[in-house]
Amino acid sequence: MDRRLLEILACPICKGKLVYSQDEQELICRFDKLAYPIHDGIPVMLPDSTRPLIER
């Protein structure tokens, strides 16, 4: 994930910062506890494409 791209992307729901998870290939919104998938290097930022984060 390009660092410059990560700096300008925001959660489409709360407009908060996203964190890149290299292991899962996802962008994480910690506020909403949602994960946005990355397919072939392209973040899928559609609210319907999210998965809820499970607290560990």
UniProtKB/Swiss-Prot annotation:
Belongs to the UPF0434 family. This is UPF0434 protein CbuK_1382. GO terms for cellular component: cytosol. Transmembrane segments: none annotated. It comes from Coxiella burnetii (strain CbuK_Q154). It comes from the Bacteria.
